[in-house]
Design a protein with these regions (language model features):
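Flexible "cap/lid" loop of the alpha/beta hydrolase fold
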Residues: 98-103, 107-142
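Short beta-strand/loop motif that positions the catalytic acidic residue
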Residues: 196, 202-204
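Conserved alpha/beta-hydrolase catalytic His-Asp/Glu region
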Residues: 121-124, 136-194
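Acidic catalytic loop of the alpha/beta-hydrolase fold
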Residues: 206-211
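Catalytic active-site module of serine/aspartate enzymes centered on a nucleophile-bearing elbow/loop
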Residues: 226-263
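Conserved acidic catalytic loop of the alpha/beta-hydrolase fold
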Residues: 68-85
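Gly/Ala-rich beta-loop-alpha elbow adjacent to hydrolase catalytic centers
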Residues: 89, 93, 97
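Conserved HGGG/HGGXW glycine-rich cap/lid loop of the alpha/beta-hydrolase fold
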Residues: 6-59
Length: 263
């Protein structure tokens, strides 16, 4: 049974307006896309989504898979009468976006994969993190997580930004966070990359310690015709760190996708 997802729909709704779905990182809520949603909703129907167990979405106890998270998104889109859509996903959201592009090619018009991976390290690391959070809450990992989200220079210059991001992680229910760690532990899409047939943008942050540029290069090399971009200076969540540049990159990608016939 899919989880009920909190979400926000912005922008015009019409048969001619393209739909853009935004999927965020582990430990985030949909506000990590606020800057992009404000701009892109001028000419897209933007659906910004909180994964299960994130933001105010339903918490489903126990482990889940990336396929489960994708099923949640599809159920949400069905409930609001969205058939075909563009999708942008960052980190965990990028894994979900990959799954959607592989398994729902008739629905996914294009995909933007930001600071993500076809495989996120070894399962044991995610199992350890899930255990730490189930035992100590997201406070057990919040500082380490936020240190990876933005560059050290930006963190030093804007302590209020660090504080806000830390509150975002702390606001994530422990079971929701841990369950999505379980999903990442089981994720390995490397053999499926060649099945992604829609226009694809692959974007890396030059200082991202979680999914460094080589992880994104692996995706770009595996997806036929993918565009590969490295942005600088940026760590793991460039939607917040350099929002205007990410918005511009997404707009160029969406415009190019439309020009190839992806409505």
């Amino acid at each position: 049974m899919p989880a009920t997802l909190s979400h926000e729909v912005s922008g015009p709704r019409s048969d001619d307006t393209p739909v853009l779905v935004l999927l965020g990182s582990l430990g985030s809520d949909r506000s990590m896309w606020d800057a992009q949603a404000r701009d892109l909703s001028r000419d897209h129907t933007v659906v910004a989504v909180d994964h299960r167990g994130h933001g105010t979405s339903e918490v489903v106890p126990g482990p889940c898979t990336i396929a489960d998270l994708a099923a949640d998104v599809l159920a949400l889109l069905d409930s609001i009468d969205v058939d075909r859509f563009h999708v942008a996903g960052l980190s965990l959201g990028g894994a979900v976006a990959q799954w959607l592009a592989v398994h729902e090619p008739t629905r996914v018009l294009s995909t933007a994969l930001l600071c993500t991976a076809a495989k996120f390290g070894e399962p044991s690391g995610w199992a350890d993190r899930a255990t730490a959070v189930r035992e100590g809450g997201t406070a057990a990992v919040a500082d380490a997580v936020v240190a990876r989200w933005i560059t050290a220079a930006r963190a030093e210059a804007e302590p209020e930004l660090v504080a806000g991001l830390r509150e975002m992680v702390l606001g994530t229910p422990a079971e929701g966070y841990a369950s999505c760690c379980d999903a990442l532990a089981g994720w390995d899409n490397r053999a499926e990359l060649g099945r992604i047939s829609c226009p694809t943008l692959v974007l890396a942050g030059d200082e991202d310690p979680s999914t460094p540029p080589e992880a994104l290069r692996e995706i770009a090399d595996g997806v036929p015709g993918a565009d590969f971009v490295v942005v600088s200076p940026a760590a793991h969540v460039p939607t917040v760190e350099i929002p205007d540049r990410i918005t511009d990159a997404l707009r160029r990608h969406l415009d190019a996708a439309r020009n190839t016939g992806a409505a």
